[in-house]
Amino acid sequence: MSLVYLLIAILVIMAMILLMSKRRALAKYAGYIALVAPVISSIYFLIQIPSVAKLQYLSTSIPWIKTLDINLDLRLDGLSLMFSLIISLIGIAVFFYATQYLSSRKDNLPRFYFYLTLFMFSMIGIVLSDNTILMYIFWELTSVSSFLLISYWYNNGDSQFGAIQSFMITVFGGLALLVGFIMLYIMTGTNNITDILGQADHIKNHGLFIPMIFMFLLGAFTKSAQFPFHIWLPRAMAAPTPVSAYLHSATMVKAGIFLLLRFTPLLGLSNMYIYIVTFVGLITMLFGSITALKQWDLKGILAYSTISQLGMIMAMVGIGGGYAQHQQDAIASIYVFVLFGALFHLMNHAIFKCALFMGVGILDHEAGSRDIRILSGMRQLFPKMNLVMTIAALSMAGVPFLNGFLSKEMFLDALTQTGQLSQFSLISMIAIVFVGVIASIFTFTYALYMVKEVFWTKYDSKVFTKKNIHEPWLFSLPSLILMVLVPVIFFVPNIFGKGIIVPALRGVSGGNHQIDPLAPHVSQWHGFNIPLLLTIIIILLGSVLAIKVDWKKVFTGKIRQISVSKGYEMVYRHFEKFATKRFKRVMQDRLNQYIIMTLGIFMIIIGYGYIRIGLPKVHQLHVSEFGALEIILAIVTVTIGISLIFIRQRLTMVILNGVIGFVVTLFFIAMKAPDLALTQLVVETITTILFIVSFSRLPNVPRSNANKKREIIKISVSLLMALIVVSLIFITQQTDGLSSISDFYLKADKLTGGKNIVNAILGDFRALDTLFEGLVLIITGLGIYTLLNYQDRRGQDERE
């Protein structure tokens, strides 16, 4: 099956979900219909594993806008396959979990599942895209769909603010990324990603290479919540828990990491890129791990833990980026080891983080709270969630016999090996190891502290008073399955490593299959070495900090109020006030003012063009024959037009405006265009009558007195627009480079059977345009009728 067919299948499912929204009896089954989408995509991508492992990549290219090299280019290689599997398989768990989490009585299920399926569709689109502009479209589609999901409970103020904040930051990054893609097109002349990566050596010497890297980093850092662009992610917790579980584990926050991995063969050629990504990742990891301890809300703890874990993965992506420079060197194996660790931890993080969010969702759903000050001793009431969240949290902390331990060991090993890499000095290595270890200690601390406070403290019935707590099996099933995978991957890591991660490494390297022998064999035991020693230190210090320190009392008062997001909120409020003032100044409910502003901007643009290229030069002007009638009609039109500026009576203005229309009708008659004259006459008559009739229903508000300054502006704008239109006519007459389409119409109108050229254009050459114009009028009429009918019924209901 083609990749396009897969995307179409998902779109069909989305359409079915929308149709179900019209029938309330079927709406409760929307989740199960939506579940088909991740199931189909999972089966499809699982089937492709053997082919991709044998270097048999799928690709599809459908021409779209050829002149701009924008095509529907899709490609399934090892990297896109790994991300697609994570998106799809985690999607099955999340979609099923959502069917148990949401209520068909309280929630609009078709709307929710449409948004969620759109979210999955856009993420799969990103990882399959082999065209930069197509990737950008899907990139922004994730921002739009996440906005809709975060604001799903739109009556909640936190949901509204969180949705706006995430949308503003990620769209800003997306626009920066688009600029980077345009720079790539300027440097290479193509939008095809495979072709771009093939020109990496040429691009690195271009003057736009460094600016392009910064644009890419802005896009990646905003999407993957790297410091200081992380602030949108905790606010996104206002979304329903299934959304949080999906967003944090498998979708949007991983898009930035995917972007950097996909373009590693190009971006890794710059040492500056390696430094920035490595140190921003480590700072984000440290900041997220410390800030997680400030939180009382379980979702808040997990949000900052995601920020920290993303920083950890990002740091490994940065260190491993040097492979682009040293593919044939002896140290290439170190870079490959680090990239393998990044991909391995990305997969592990998706599993344990999704399980953690599902556990928190069940606690919130059944206990009615996520506050660790209220929840205590929950192991008695939630034995299954105690097991799920404890194992998942310990995996995140890097405890042995769980999958997180293996990838955390690879992370520590990568840090200690940076001293052997040419990009890092001894001082850099010491700083990297120090920050990484401190961040890992706090990671262990918040993971252990979270489960200790919720499950392993003494149950206090005075604080937590809710009764009749239960854990439905179907509700718990997805998180239990994910929990089982945590130790399973620890014992059989190479099944996933050889079948999924190694092919993904080929994608990171730009399709270089020679990377396979350099890929590490994951072992549970490496003997006593520096990473193991660091792990022991992390576990000991982290345990002490988690058990002995009451972090609820540490971050209090002014310390708790310190937040990076406060700066964003302050800037946002100032911009909002500024925008409101400007809006009120510009939008004064005066149609003529809007027209003047619109035409003014248009004239500025045209005027700038004339300044750059010079005024049009008239070599030979072809003027149609005209007589006394045309001169008289022109004088009448101009005279009436000028008089309209000074007349105060509205009825007189409407009548004179109609007179201008009738004069235009006479122009058409003089030009021997009876069809146009008849059409103009009918339209002008109806319009004038409607204007006059409408006055009987409007209040008799006198027109404001003439303002000399305002009238001068109106006359000036009118005259300038007239000059611009005339100059454009001159330009078109002087242009000989392109053949006129009029000749085609004149030669082909006989074939249409029309009586004249106008009939032929409207009825044949522009038949679809005419059809859709009619449809627009019909839809507009139906919309007006619906609004009027709604208002009538509403007024009737209020009277009753």
Swiss-Prot record:
- Whether Transmembrane counts among this entry's keywords is yes
**What gene is this protein translated from?**
mnhA2
Which domain of life does the UniProt lineage start with?
Bacteria
* Subcellular location, record wording: Cell membrane
Question: What is one term from the GO cellular component aspect held by the record?
Answer: plasma membrane
Q: What is this protein called?
A: Putative antiporter subunit mnhA2
Q: Name one GO biological process term.
A: monoatomic ion transport
Bilayer-crossing residues are 1-21, 33-53, 78-98, 118-138, 167-187, 207-227, 241-261, 273-293, 300-320, 331-351, 387-407, 424-444, 472-492, 527-547, 595-615, 627-647, 651-671, 676-696, 712-732, 768-788
**Topology versus the membrane:** Multi-pass membrane protein
Species lineage: Bacteria, Bacillati, Bacillota, Bacilli, Bacillales
GO molecular-function term, one example from the UniProt record: antiporter activity
Keywords, A to Z, come to:
Antiport, Cell membrane, Ion transport, Membrane, Transmembrane, Transmembrane helix, Transport
Q: How does it assemble?
A: May form a heterooligomeric complex that consists of seven subunits: mnhA2, mnhB2, mnhC2, mnhD2, mnhE2, mnhF2 and mnhG2.
